[in-house]
Amino acid sequence: MGEAEVKDNEVYEEDLVDYEEEVENGADGGAAAANASADVVKKGYVGIHSSGFRDFLLKPELLRAIQDCGFEHPSEVQHECIPQAILGMDVICQAKSGMGKTAVFVLSSLQQIDPVAGQVGALVLCHTRELAYQICHEFERFSKYLPEVKVAVFYGGVHIKKHKDLLKNDCPHIVVGTPGRILALAREKDLSLKNVRHFILDECDKMLDSLDMRRDVQEIFKMTPHDKQVMMFSATLSKEIRPVCKKFMQDPMEIYVDDEAKLTLHGLVQHYIKLSEAEKNRKLNDLLDALDFNQVVIFVKSVSRAAELNKLLCECNFPAISIHSGMTQEERLTRYKNFKEGHKRILVATDLVGRGIDIERVNIVINYDMPDSADSYLHRVGRAGRFGTKGLAITFVSSASDSDVLNQVQERFEVDIKELPEQIDTSTYMPS
């Protein structure tokens, strides 16, 4: 490769906006956390609708893959969305964490796509590398018996030439990626979007709330055909952001499975502990010793705190791992897989893991640092008790501002979060 080409690619890497990082006091930057694949849940979520996936008249190959994953009944959001989505309708959907939104657009896209060599037929955008990786994995799981369908994931942190070569030599039919990398590939004409028939945004409010990311999404959107299906999904979709979403759509079907004020999480026990900053480490050690858990996610507010807390836990012989932006992409994915596969039972992370990423075995979330908003709280604690299973969320409250956020959570979501009792019944948060 020539020197000029190397420089061009270096410029690309510099220009890519790493949306997943929210800089906090310079060196503290946001953290890349990684966790697990949206395992639309083995054993399946049995919702209020008893009809099976067969009622949707999906391709036999999809039904076979669904059966392999252990699903029996669609969740409420799947029951509401899939019948319309597979007909090509535009969809805007808000439903609480863990209700299988990813499977809606994955199954709908695979049902409709007619793979043509050299043409990208579906494009999925999301705001982090880890979520992109996870969504790609879901497409691979459900397209298990559709070998002619090729799926690829593109995000920053990987040399752009690898992505260009893949597009040139083995063009995928479905592309999942972050806006920065997708836009870079499309601007250089390496990625053609002229045949896209399905345009999907996952965690759409996260992308459209950010002005820079919204501009990138809009530019990508304009490169796709006018005649296409647009689907947008999120666990939190404020009334303010909904009109922005609709500007991308034509007469969309709107599905708000949960009233915004009642986004409580199915099967989740929530408590708080009042303590000083200096008492946090001792209390965390006590909790990890006393509680029964399959896997636990501990949320902190910065990369440096994630690294420090992980070091402390490892010194205390806890099986902990942390994932942050100071690592190479390869190292991050390696750790992500280790946690997902259960090799480590404790993940220390920042808010990056708080949105959209699912690991079935996680049944406890600990907010070592209070999140900065009620929305962030919802997304964080939603990592436990996924898909209607049991879970426990414990939040450390160490300041007046922490108390304010806790009050906002209780008022907005109409929940009564009580102080953690001396003894807690394991059966309330451990799946039987």
Swiss-Prot record:
Protein name: DEAD-box ATP-dependent RNA helicase 15
Coiled-coil regions, chain positions: 3-28
Catalytic activity: ATP + H2O = ADP + phosphate + H(+)
CDD domains cross-referenced by the UniProt entry: DEADc_DDX39, SF2_C_DEAD
Annotated GO MF terms: ATP binding; ATP hydrolysis activity; mRNA binding; RNA helicase activity
The organism of origin for this protein: Oryza sativa subsp. japonica
Pfam families linked: DEAD, Helicase_C
Domain notes from UniProt: The Q motif is unique to and characteristic of the DEAD box family of RNA helicases and controls ATP binding and hydrolysis.
Family: Belongs to the DEAD box helicase family. DECD subfamily.
